[in-house]
A protein has these predicted regions:
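A residue-level structural signature of the nucleotidyltransferase/glycosyltransferase Rossmann-like core
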Residues: 26, 46-48, 67, 81, ...
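Short, flexible, basic/aromatic active-site loop/helix in glycosyltransferases
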Residues: 59-84
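Short, hinge-like loop/turn segments at secondary-structure boundaries
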Residues: 38-39, 63-69, 138-139
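Structural motif
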Residues: 17-20, 45-48, 56, 65-67, ...
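Conserved beta-loop-beta/alpha segment of the NTase-like Rossmann-fold superfamily
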Residues: 1-62, 79
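Short, glycine- and charge-enriched coil/turn segments that flank and shape catalytic ligand pockets
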Residues: 11-17, 43, 61-67, 95-102, ...
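Conserved alpha/beta core of the MobA/IspD/sugar-nucleotide pyrophosphorylase nucleotidyltransferase superfamily
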Residues: 76-146
């Protein structure tokens, strides 16, 4: 909802170009990551920071039965920032808001689902963690003490 409000303000003010959307819960963003995202979004129109997963991933059903083990080399964990051509993300949100949004977990999903435009991964950092649990806070403190 906060992203949509910000996008509406940009649209009302006649802004164009690109927008980066970043979680406030990811304090370890670097200039290098921002530069890579900026360069990529100008070429591809939609990109997400992320990193390859280290663990094997299992897709399960509601009964927790394993249904699939995807090829780990093709699975990345998404981070932020996520960057988009402004008109693209605004139109994607306008379309998505007419539907159920409860399953949407990041802004790239809206573009993927609504626009059919490829979204590209940009290498981030394993240090670009999202601090949401007490365990995350322990890791963040360790990063700060290094």
């Amino acid at each position: 909802e906060s992203v949509w409000k910000a996008l509406c303000i940009l649209k009302e003010r006649g802004q164009s170009g690109f927008v980066m959307i970043h979680d406030g819960a990811r304090p370890f963003i670097t200039d290098e990551i921002l530069k890579r995202v900026y360069e990529q979004v100008q070429v591809q129109k939609a990109c997400v920071v992320g990193m390859p997963v280290k663990d094997t991933i299992k897709l399960i059903n509601k009964e927790k039965q394993i249904k699939e083990s995807p090829d780990r080399s093709l699975v990345w964990q998404a981070q932020t920032p996520q960057a988009f051509e402004l008109s693209l993300i605004v139109e994607a949100f306008e379309r998505q808001l007419k539907e159920d949004c409860s399953h949407i977990t990041d802004d790239a999903m809206v573009v993927e689902k609504q626009m059919g435009v490829p979204v590209y991964m940009v290498e981030g950092s394993y240090n670009n963690i999202k601090i949401t649990t007490p365990e995350d806070l322990v890791i963040a403190r360790a990063f700060l003490n290094v």
